[in-house]
Amino acid sequence: MIICCKGGDVMFITLEGIDGCGKSTQARLLCEALSARGAVVQTREPGGWEGGAELRSMVLGGSLKHPWSELFLFLLDRAEHSARVITPALEAGKHVVCERYHDSTLAYQVWGRGMPFEPLRGAAELAGFPKPEVTVLFDIEPELALSRVAKRGRPDAFESEGLAFMRRIAEGYRALAAADEKRWIVVKCGERTAEEIFAEMKRGLVGKGLPL
């Protein structure tokens, strides 16, 4: 069964974008705003559940030698994360804000790694993962994103792949958003402040029925 939250009472919101786009900052700002109106769970993938830290370390640490190993670990992480964190929160009447979800798998594994689109697109439905009502894409030019990543230091396995890889992923995200405009909100980032970006996201979420 797919859990899809409708009607604005409870929403499952996912935040997407290439590394360095500012998802974590926006997740924090959104959860602060939502917590003033009710219960909210802030989480992330990979690793957003008890026991997930080891999986996160494996997929981001660069130790895996085969792209399918990477994919299967992401799906394992998502299955446990959904069962242990996302679904219980939604059933308890809480909003859920998640940094990265199944669209990350499509963007990174399909556009980034060249894996087949159709089987992976249907994996979430086949597994019965909760379906987000709204997905926000923080759209940023890869050159700017990588410059931000470089300032942070110690890039992970994906951040180390370079500009061409990030360009493919950015293209993938834009294609996914264009194919499902009802679910997606696209926020252009560029050199804008976090407050400006949040204000645009907030307008988009209100337009999708989220009381903010």
Protein language model regions, located:
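NTP-dependent small-molecule kinase module
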Residues: 2-9, 31, 143-212
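ATP-dependent small-molecule kinase phosphotransfer cores
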Residues: 39-126
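Conserved lysine of the Walker
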Residues: 23
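Walker A (P-loop) ATP-phosphate-binding motif of ABC ATPase nucleotide-binding domains
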Residues: 12
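P-loop (Walker A) phosphate-binding loop of NTP-binding proteins
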Residues: 18
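A glycine- and Lys/Arg-enriched "phosphate-lid" helix/loop adjacent to the NTP-binding pocket
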Residues: 104-171
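Hydrophobic positions on the alpha1 helix immediately C-terminal to the Walker A/P-loop
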Residues: 26
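Hydrophobic anchor at the beta1->P-loop junction of P-loop NTPases
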Residues: 15
